[in-house]
Amino acid sequence: MQYEIVSAGEDVDDERARGRRAAAPAAPSSAVPSSAALSSAALSSAAQPTGAPPATAAARRGRDLPRERLLARGPAALSDAELVALLLGSGLPGHDVFALAHTLLARFGSLRALLDAAPDDFKGLRGIGPARTAILVAVVELARRALAEKARERPLVDSPGAVDDYLRLLIGTRPREVFVCLFLDARHRLVQTEETAHGSLTRMAVYPREIVRRALALNAAALIVAHNHPSGAVRPSAADRRLTRVLRDALALVDIKLIDHFVVGASDTFSFAQAGWI
């Protein structure tokens, strides 16, 4: 498009004359395009590969979407909120899925707390209905089962890191104390994991006799036990040490070995065996 610049002092009659000339039909021009026009056309042609359709705005945005970046660069390239957004799938009217993901993380305080939430914890949250609740809960359960499967493949005493990861995912962020038994076979491979006691923030009743009875029923040769401290502090209490001694001695009467007792927090664990207390 061409623009005509009119100076402030230009004669009005000249303006009318130009108007009459503009109204007359213009003769076809055979003028050769200017060098500037040719250069502009050449640059425009060079910017677009021959035969390729022009890149659309949607295509350019697609390169920046989390799904595309995950497939191209791996999941480590995404933030916590972006990974949660992929699970949620879509947002709400006026709020995109990324805003919803950030809201969820802020509501629960951390990614671990979000993924450890029970189905009832999502009730009343705008944008999180039964379908999305099921997806979030299922993802964590799949991770737990994968770690348990890994624990069954080799002796647990040979892979303490796998035990730590499994226990932190299992009970590390529970809001109440939970006592867990990992029943092992003669080769110290995982046979079964069971929660044998539940308590409050500071108190829990554990019955060694019931644990021994269950170990015999599963034909277990050894046990690893664990409980969480909701406070996050993993230093064992005097009651924890006393329970460990009682349980170790009760299992020894039926020739079952207590290999370790873990105290589990959200980001750390304490091993009685490593401390030399078993």
Swiss-Prot record:
Region (Disordered): 1-64
Sample GO molecular function, one term: metal ion binding
Motif (JAMM motif): 227-240
Low complexity bias spans: 22-59
Superkingdom as given in the UniProt entry: Bacteria
Positions annotated to bind Zn(2+): 227, 229, 240
Stored InterPro entries: MPN (IPR037518), RadC_JAB (IPR025657), RuvA_2-like (IPR010994), UPF0758 (IPR001405), UPF0758_CS (IPR020891), UPF0758_N (IPR046778)
Record-annotated disulphide pairs: none
Stored Pfam families: RadC, UPF0758_N
NCBIfam families membership: PRK00024.1, radc
Protein name per UniProt: UPF0758 protein BMA2230
Organism of origin: Burkholderia mallei (strain ATCC 23344)
